[in-house]
Swiss-Prot record:
Region described as C-terminal domain: 398-514
Application notes: Expression of 10 genes for alpha-carboxysome (Cb) proteins (cbbL-cbbS-csoS2-csoS3-csoS4A-csoS4B-csoS1C-csoS1A-csoS1B-csoS1D) in E.coli generates compartments that resemble Cb, contain RuBisCO and have its catalytic activity, showing it is possible to make artificial, functional Cb using these 10 genes. Cargo proteins can be targeted to these organelles. Artificial Cb assembly in E.coli requires csoS2-csoS4A-csoS4B-csoS1C-csoS1A-csoS1B-csoS1D (but not the gene for carbonic anhydrase, csoS3).
Descriptive protein name: Carboxysome shell carbonic anhydrase
Residues binding Zn(2+): C173, H242, C253
Cell compartments where the protein resides: Carboxysome
Protein task: Reversible hydration of carbon dioxide. Essential for chemolithotrophic carbon dioxide fixation, supplies CO(2) to RuBisCO (ribulose bisphosphate carboxylase, cbbL-cbbS) in the carboxysome. There are estimated to be 40 CsoSCA dimers per carboxysome. Unlike beta-carboxysomes, alpha-carboxysomes (Cb) can form without cargo protein. CsoS2 is essential for Cb formation and is also capable of targeting foreign proteins to the Cb. The Cb shell assembles with the aid of CsoS2; CsoS1A, CsoS1B and CsoS1C form the majority of the shell while CsoS4A and CsoS4B form vertices. CsoS1D forms pseudohexamers that probably control metabolite flux into and out of the shell.
Details of cofactor binding: The fourth ligand is a water molecule. Binds 1 Zn(2+) per monomer, in PDB:2FGY a second Zn(2+) is seen, but one of its ligands is an accidentally introduced mutation.
Keyword field contains Metal-binding: yes
Molecular function, one GO term: carbonate dehydratase activity
């Protein structure tokens, strides 16, 4: 799909250096064993794969964080396996509680255990509760981390403004492999002006985003935050699609049938529609900047589609960070930075299918350059922990729970949760359906229930906001139970309902389902 015009007789460059049109519409094929090693390092077998721009300290901290969070979830099933072998009867509750405290770090509600002598093991209920407790602990851990990184957030806001953006609104696919997009893949801290909402297939809600844009612009006008409305900065909307280089027709985007071309074009079309909506709904030159990013979920390397001088994007005009990684691996840090920024300019100068109208603005090029540099650390993160490519059990789906609603912005780790953003089940049924489909294979096939965390945020400054948010969470809870009644009747859906004030890091407040 070319958003500018059709050049049916011209060939498109592959990446930024080849004149061969990339195969976006892939045919059925088996996993490619040639990708067992990271493609950026495959030509350098004699060298340790460590890029000169990699932030080793950050990688170590992120690794410890990922291990500690996932370990809480991964302890649940081994705990249940031991519980299943404990004889039912008088000592059952005491033995299970002692085991829970030593294995999970907490005890269990008495009602999950007290009727064991007549009803047997309540393994499904215990699984749901233990998973919810692991999520609570993860949220608290990330909240502490966010509070300790306030200086990084302030620096990020300053960087956005220097690049000409007063807000950055990111809509990745809801796939759990993109759950760590901000802190890991892009290395961007959460700020009050960084918005992230995930949707199946990156198909974000244009009306919701238009309302977010209006709210942001009104705040600039009324409060001068983060800058005043007369400053020549823009609202940046980013859509993020994903693909798999090792198994493109099976491990790509589930919402688009693992069709890379469909995933890319759908995200690009949504971006164009959103920009048109802003321009049509508001006068006086109102508009936004848009950016499209692809993520290889095998390696976490990004592909950034470069806008031209008019802000138009093109499926074939991009910088592949796997290529820039290999090109700059042996250089000094300053030399590597120069090559990366030259790659952006070279993409803008592409001919054929990738040809655009001039180069992107200086601020946009600077922003893209920093994303590419940040992502080099993530490429090395995967190299150091997994040999350059995630193992087979993590290349596909390996989520621990379904997150429904506004999501837990604090908790962002790969393959931790499948995210379904919705206000009503009817409006976003596909998001929930895709999640249930994924967990049918992950959990139901093993006899495990599906943990569903329904979570919404409220504005504490608005009277009655919390009460209405609780009602909303309960309405969604009942709607999901009704939509998947056969699973619910078998106790195969384990719910946790909670609400939270809008401020990042605010306490999680669990609420009853009725």
């Amino acid at each position: 799909m070319n958003t500018r015009n059709t050049r049916s007789k011209q060939r498109a460059p592959f990446g930024v250096s080849s004149s061969v049109k990339p195969r976006l519409d892939l045919i059925e094929q088996a996993p490619n064993p040639a990708y067992d090693r990271h493609p950026a390092c495959i030509t350098l077998p004699e060298r340790t794969c460590r890029h000169p721009l990699t932030d080793l300290e950050a990688n170590e901290q992120l690794g410890r964080c990922e291990d500690s969070v996932k370990n809480r979830f991964d302890r649940v099933i081994p705990f249940l396996q031991v519980v299943a072998g404990i004889p039912l009867g008088l000592d059952y509750v005491t033995r299970v509680q002692e085991l829970a405290q030593s294995s999970l770090g907490h005890t269990l509600p008495e009602e999950l255990l007290k009727d064991n002598w007549i009803s047997g093991h309540n393994l499904k209920g215990i699984f749901g509760y233990a998973t919810a407790k692991a999520l609570t602990a993860a949220t608290e851990q990330f909240s502490r981390k966010i509070m300790s990184e306030k200086d990084d957030s302030a620096s990020a806001i300053g960087f956005f403004l220097d690049c000409g953006f007063h807000a950055v609104d990111i809509s990745p696919c809801a796939d759990g492999r993109l759950k760590g997009l901000l802190p890991y893949i892009l290395r961007l801290p959460l700020t009050a002006f960084t918005y992230r909402k995930a949707y199946a297939g990156s198909m974000f809600d244009i009306e919701d985003d238009l309302a977010q844009w209006e709210k942001n612009e009104l705040r600039r006008y009324r409060e001068g935050v983060p800058n005043t409305a007369d400053q020549p900065t823009r609202y940046l909307k980013i859509a993020v699609y994903h693909f798999s280089t090792s198994d493109p027709t099976h491990s790509g985007c589930a919402a688009h049938g693992s069709n890379d071309r469909a995933a890319l074009e759908a995200a690009l079309t949504q971006l164009m529609k959103f920009r048109e909506a802003v321009e049509n709904a508001h006068c006086c030159g109102a508009s936004i900047d848009i950016l499209l990013i692809g993520v290889d979920t095998d390696t976490d390397a990004i592909r950034v589609h470069i806008p031209d001088s008019k802000g138009f994007l093109n499926p074939y005009r991009y910088v592949d960070n796997t290529v820039t990684y290999a090109q700059t691996l042996h250089l000094a840090p300053d030399e590597a930075r120069v090559i990366i920024h030259e790659a952006i300019l070279n993409a803008n100068r592409s001919d054929g299918w990738a040809k655009g109208n001039g180069v992107a603005s200086e601020g946009m090029r600077r922003f893209i350059g920093q994303l590419l540099i940040n992502n080099l650390s993530q490429i090395d993160y995967v190299v150091n922990r997994h040999g350059g490519r995630y193992p087979p059990n993590d290349i596909g789906h390996a989520e621990r729970y379904i997150s429904v609603g506004d999501g837990f912005d604090e908790v962002q780790i790969r393959n931790l949760a499948y995210y379904a953003h919705l206000d009503t089940v009817e409006e976003n049924a596909i998001d929930v359906d895709v999640g249930i489909k994924i967990f049918t294979k992950l959990n139901l096939s093993r006899g495990l229930p599906i943990p569903i965390a329904i979570h919404y945020r409220y504005d504490p400054n608005v009277p009655g906001s919390r009460e209405r948010t609780v009602v909303k969470a309960r309405r969604i809870y009942n709607a999901i139970k009704e939509r998947f009644s056969s699973l619910d009747e078998q106790n195969l859906l384990q719910f946790r309902l909670s609400v939270q004030a809008q401020d990042i890091g605010s306490p999680i407040e669990e609420v009853a389902s009725a």
